[in-house]
Amino acid sequence: IRTSNGSLGYVKEDNLGKINTIRDDMVETSKVEGKVSLAWEYFSDYGSAPERSGAMDGVNVVSPTFFRLEQLGKGNVKENVGTAGINYINWAHNNGLKVWAMISNESMLDTTSEIMNDYKLRNKLINNIVNLVVKYNLDGINIDFENMYMEDKAMFNRFLIELEPRLNEMGKVLTVDVTAPDGSETWSMCFDRNTISKVADYIIFMAYDQYGASSNKEGTTAGCDWVEANITKFLGQEGVNPDKLVLAVPFYTRLWKEANGKVSSETVDLKD
């Protein structure tokens, strides 16, 4: 049983009455057959979803950046779908693509921490996510919560554990973005990758940046050796199921400059 504040407990079997088991109707899942080939579609303004026509070669899932947490919003979610976003969803479905919309925490440490540590706020956020999935006929949700307190690791797990069955009962997919295993407390050590991989349908390794914009030395964005070493850690010390691991690669690089003993960089995107 679960109390009103989210704590779990039990009741002795002797104190239970007659138990009736009800078999739910099977719900068709929104998972993809075979390997996941996903493309994030980034846009920030309301109703600014890109117009698309025809299929995307090699892609079977799109993840538009539709949702983000409100700062100090107590579990509320901002959306930027609009008519353009609805047309985008219809285009994707008409071309056989799954839509796993992304929700971001905008790297807001304190806002995220407040929600994760409050059962009522977590439940409010979960209800908002579920309502948006239904409202826009989405096939799943991609959780992109970055820059979190390491101390909130267990409560982030709790959030996912509470969200997953709500999506699963509708046949919807839960995916979670995570960083490389080795790094800072708020960037890397805030994720329990083993538990996340058990709860979510897919865990997405954001294989970037090996050397980011704030680095004090120049280097590659995602070197092959670095990526392979981290995949080995995911499958080894982190205990992630390989069937659930999705590798996200950067379609950008950095041009580095050095002047007066200091380095700076410029981001260069991959062009069509």
Model-derived features: positions:
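Substrate-binding cleft of extracellular glycoside hydrolase catalytic domains
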Residues: 81-141, 145-146
